[in-house]
């Protein structure tokens, strides 16, 4: 039994070696027609990297010929399927420019835009590629609003917008973390104004409340009452939009202290009359 297993493994290794050897011979061959045939076989079998190398070799040979359109599309798509998105975007765009009347024009335009989408980095990094991806996807939607890919394109734009929102919000929140409370207030105001429909609006209003709280409770006496009242207004604003806010416990705890301080101001004012 053990001998059979070893024999089977040896056979597999030899088969792979022969296969690799045949593929290398094909790469070194001058038989363009056979390369084209095998490139499509590899592509259809999901061996996109192997297909890609063959397509790359034969693209110049078929340029200007009837097969060129098909080959260039599959060349681009083999990059896409191999997750080489930068090269895929370039080749799809090359296809779109070369064959504007192709039956595959929508698919190529969409996949070019989708390639930019896949290149968008995590929110903590520079978002230049995210903006570019949104632009490409929006251009696609404008060109083909009824396309079968339009819904997916809109969904990708929404995801990228959320990434930009998170980026801006984390910057706004960072001001609070480093105790630059005035900048935190301004940044969160700008964030809410810039992204009125954001899912992070509740938290942004809360972070602004926290910044106002730190300023108000540490103010000199001459400015304290006005700032505590501003804090009351921010608290009321949060409850108006989010009556069951996730931050209720902390908000109520802080407002108890605020209200007690305001009562002291009211008592002092009454006694002075």
Regions found by a protein language model. Give the residues of each.
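Bacterial N-terminal signal peptides
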Residues: 10-17
